[in-house]
């Protein structure tokens, strides 16, 4: 939709896999919530439409003006996004399978100081404060450490894959559309450590069935029932995003290039003697930050912390309806929709030490589960007739 609908702004909240897209219709409506109302197959859903498999979507319509959105009341104050999923069609049963596999890379690195530039600017700072230079000319000339922390944390060629299986068909009596989708994305920061990943499994069944249809009768001559039912299971892990200080990317940009990723063997032994919970990878101790770096720590050590948490989400959205032809042009429709969601978090951690302001002193474990449900029932008549054509 981005760039295709006037007056609609769509931005991604972060580069995290499956990060929400912010949709703004007619600008920002309120301070706390400017999200539009999402309607999927006639059912208002909470939490956006990230749960949907994009290949299951047949059409998306945006209601921007107050008149067209008036039927939804105050809920439509920020606009309405109408989503219609695919339905079956008459004809032979068709089975299709689609597969895609690709790679992702950071499109740009932040320009930061290398080791030589860093020592030079630090000396200038010391001199401007009336102090002696921190690094001598020999230190600058003989320095052998020049760590590019962005290269150390970026997960280059992070894979993303998608599988889609669908079955479509029908006859004069019924139509059906069935789909099974799987999507997996590895994040470009922390994805190779299992810390920034997204996995979605989706199942959909849309069907209609004509209970009866009598062509030679003008009243009560047809009844149609239908079911649109979708289930989605999401699993995701994430790193801290949009944070200047203390996060993995924040440290990768601001941390000193003079600090090596791993401490020397002698220094590593000294670190473990003072801090037994320091991070060790492949038998090597990851460097600790020098004094004065406050919350900034070795970003590679952050990726190797003995902690891990996963967000879980399970969502079922269904619409059940029946439609009766009463008279020519006059129909009655009754529908019931439900949005049932379960979401939670499971995580654990062990004691660790990354710096004076970043450490965990005790093991912990956490598990939570939430449930939310909304339902809607609609009963209405519609009349469609053309006069004096």
Question: Each PLM stretch: what is its role?
Answer:
Residues 1-205, 209-225, 317-318:
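Short, small/polar-rich motifs associated with maturation and membrane association
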Residues 330:
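An active-site-proximal structural segment forming one wall of the substrate-binding cleft
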């Amino acid at each position: 939709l981005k760039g295709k609908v006037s007056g609609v702004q769509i931005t991604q909240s972060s580069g995290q896999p499956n990060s929400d897209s912010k949709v703004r219709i007619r600008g920002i409506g309120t301070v706390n919530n400017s999200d539009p109302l999402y309607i999927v197959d006639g059912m208002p859903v909470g939490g956006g439409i990230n749960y949907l498999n994009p290949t299951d979507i047949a059409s998306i319509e945006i209601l921007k003006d107050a008149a067209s959105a008036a039927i939804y009341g105050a809920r439509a104050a920020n606009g309405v996004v109408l989503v219609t999923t695919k339905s079956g069609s008459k004809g032979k049963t068709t089975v299709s399978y689609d597969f895609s596999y690709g790679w992702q890379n950071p499109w740009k690195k932040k320009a930061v100081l290398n080791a030589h530039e860093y020592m030079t600017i630090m000396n200038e700072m010391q001199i401007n404060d009336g102090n002696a230079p921190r690094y001598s000319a020999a230190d600058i000339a003989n320095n052998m450490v020049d760590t590019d922390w962005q290269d150390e944390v970026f997960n280059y060629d992070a894979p993303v894959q998608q599988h889609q299986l669908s079955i479509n068909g029908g006859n004069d009596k019924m139509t059906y559309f069935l789909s099974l989708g799987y999507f997996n994305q590895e994040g470009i920061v922390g994805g190779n450590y299992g810390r920034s990943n997204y996995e979605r499994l989706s199942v959909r069944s849309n069907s209609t069935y004509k209970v009866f249809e009598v062509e030679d009768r003008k009243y009560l001559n047809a009844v149609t029932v239908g079911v649109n039912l979708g289930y989605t299971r999401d699993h995701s892990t994430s790193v801290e995003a949009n944070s200047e200080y203390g996060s993995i990317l924040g440290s990768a940009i601001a941390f000193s290039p003079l600090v090596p990723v791993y401490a020397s063997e002698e220094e590593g032994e000294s670190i473990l003697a003072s801090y037994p919970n320091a991070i060790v990878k492949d038998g090597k101790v990851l460097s600790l930050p020098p004094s004065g770096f406050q919350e900034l720590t070795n970003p590679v050590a952050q990726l190797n912390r003995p902690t891990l948490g996963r967000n879980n989400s399970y969502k079922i959205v269904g619409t059940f309806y029946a439609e009766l032809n009463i008279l020519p042009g006059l129909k009655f429709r009754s529908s019931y929709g439900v949005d049932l969601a379960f979401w939670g978090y499971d995580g654990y951690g062990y004691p660790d030490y990354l710096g004076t302001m970043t450490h965990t002193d005790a093991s912990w474990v956490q598990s939570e589960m939430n449930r939310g449900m909304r339902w809607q029932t609609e009963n209405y008549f519609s009349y469609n007739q053309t006069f004096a054509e």
